[in-house]
Amino acid sequence: MDAQTFKEWQDPEINAVNRAPMHTNFFAYESTEAATEAVKEKSANFMTLNGIWKFRWVKDSDARPTDFWKIGYNDKGWDDLPIPAMWELNGYDVPLYSGVGFDWKLWKGWCKNNPPVVPVENNHVGSYRREIIVPSDWKGKDIIAHFGSVSSNIYLWVNGKFVGYSEDSKLEAEFNLTSYLKPGQKNLIAFQVFRWCDGSYLEDQDFFRYHGVARDCYLYSRNKKRIEDLRVTPD
C-alpha cells in the first residue's frame, strides 16, 4: 500500500500495513566487544528517537491535521513533547480508570458498544513531527524503526511518504525504512496516534487508560544478510 486510506483504524480486517514481521526480541551488535558489553544505546547500529518532538493534540478525531506529514509543513505553533510520554500525564486531558468496560463508556452520551466503530467525539489524536540525521555509514544497510508501545495505533510517514500502520498497544511495532531514509541527510519522521481504534475492543484491561507513546523508540541498522529471528524447539 503506497498511501493511507484512514479507514484502517476502524477496519477489523486490518491490523497492520507494511509492519515488519514480529520476531524474537534481541539486538545485533557490530562486534563481539560491543555484544559483551550489551548496551545497545552505545552501539554504532543504534539511534534513539526518544527526546523532544513537535506535537499537536486534538480532542476529536475529525479535527486532526491530515497533511502534517508533508515536507515544509509549518509546525512552529505546535507544542514540544518528549517521547516516551503519555498524553494524560502531560496536560492533555485526564487519565480515566475502568475496571470493567471500555473507557469510551465513561463519556456521557456515548455509551454503546458497536464494534468495530469507536467514537469520533473525544477520540483524541496526537500528531508528531521531527527531523533527524541518520548516520552516513548506515548507507547500504537495512534501517528499521522500532516503536516500543504506542496506544492505540500508529500511522507513520517518512520524508512525506506513507510507510505503514500498526495496532496492538502493548506490542512493539517495527517498519523497514531503508527505501525512505537518506543516510547523512536530514529526514522528516511524522506519525499520528489515535486514542481509540477498532483494536481497542480487544484491550479492555483493569488499569488506567493512558494514550501516546509508552516505551522507547529508536532506529537500528542491520546487514542485508543476517539472522532475523530465533526459535528454540525443546525435545
Regions found by a protein language model. Give the residues of each.
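Short, contiguous pre-domain boundary segments
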Residues: N25-E37
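Short beta-strand segments of immunoglobulin-like
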Residues: R231-D235
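Hydrophobic small-molecule pocket/channel-lining residues, especially in calycin-type beta-barrels
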Residues: D62, D80-L81, N90, L96
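Short Gly/aromatic-enriched secondary-structure transition segments
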Residues: R64-G77, L81-I83
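N-terminal helix-cap/turn-to-beta initiation motif at the start of protein domains
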Residues: E41-N50
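Surface-exposed, low-complexity/disordered Ser/Thr/Gly/Pro/Asn-rich loops and linkers
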Residues: N90, V94-P95, G99-V118
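Accessory beta-strand-rich segments of carbohydrate-active enzymes
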Residues: D2-A20, A28, V39-K40, K54-V58, ...
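A broad, low-specificity signal marking well-ordered, structured residues that form hydrophobic/aromatic
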Residues: M47, K76, L81, G126, ...
